Amino acid sequence: MSGFKQHTGLVVPLDTANIDTDAIIPKQFLQKVNRIGFGKHLFHDWRFLDDAGEQPNPEFVMNAPRYQGATVLLARENFGCGSSREHAPWALADYGIQVMIAPSFADIFYGNSINNQMVPVRLTESEVDEIFQFVEANEGAEVTVDLEVMLVTANNKQYSFEIDEFRRHCLLNGLDNIGLTLQHADKISEYEAKIPSFLK
């Protein structure tokens, strides 16, 4: 995986609190175990008026022409609550979302997002309010997220955020659990060479 350093992208504002993983990706779409193909089902019950996903809901914000191609999702508190399904960040990533900004995220969802190379940015409620106002008032509004200096820039204003150093290291260097393990491949091979043959 390539690392995440900085991203500037169009923002889609999802002005709802406590969005759970069943809303992000409904259970009927969880049959697959790879990460590809879930984007078309993202927020299915909100994006579409029919079960087949052929009739877009014109009232849902992500279907608005002005937000097509958005790569930054702006949300309210407790985003990603509910079950621990990793399909939720898979769906967001497959749709094209690279950054999520909210006052808070569910803990498991937060970790799963980072494992899938998406950056969940926690700002204060008042800061999120300011960005909502900026995005909704300005078609084509973009924000820049700089992970190296941990700053969000929106409407010529900067907002600082925090992320623990280990997770930041993983994001900057594009490391998932497998990548972290492979960093120690030499030591693993050295250890395996010392194991008695009857234990192999």
UniProtKB/Swiss-Prot annotation:
GO terms for cellular component: 3-isopropylmalate dehydratase complex. Keywords: Amino-acid biosynthesis, Branched-chain amino acid biosynthesis, Leucine biosynthesis, Lyase. It comes from the Bacteria. Pathway: Amino-acid biosynthesis; L-leucine biosynthesis; L-leucine from 3-methyl-2-oxobutanoate: step 2/4. Its EC number is 4.2.1.33. It catalyses: (2R,3S)-3-isopropylmalate = (2S)-2-isopropylmalate. GO terms for molecular function: 3-isopropylmalate dehydratase activity. The keyword Amino-acid biosynthesis applies. Transmembrane segments: none annotated. GO terms for biological process: L-leucine biosynthetic process. InterPro entries: 3-IsopropMal_deHydase_ssu, Aconitase/3IPM_dehydase_swvl, AconitaseA/IPMdHydase_ssu_swvl, IPMI_Swivel, LeuD. It is an enzyme of class 4 (lyase). PANTHER family: 3-ISOPROPYLMALATE DEHYDRATASE SMALL SUBUNIT, 3-ISOPROPYLMALATE DEHYDRATASE SMALL SUBUNIT 2-RELATED-RELATED. Belongs to the LeuD family. LeuD type 1 subfamily. Heterodimer of LeuC and LeuD. Catalyzes the isomerization between 2-isopropylmalate and 3-isopropylmalate, via the formation of 2-isopropylmaleate. This is 3-isopropylmalate dehydratase small subunit. It comes from Aliivibrio fischeri (strain MJ11). The lineage of its organism: Bacteria, Pseudomonadati, Pseudomonadota, Gammaproteobacteria, Vibrionales.
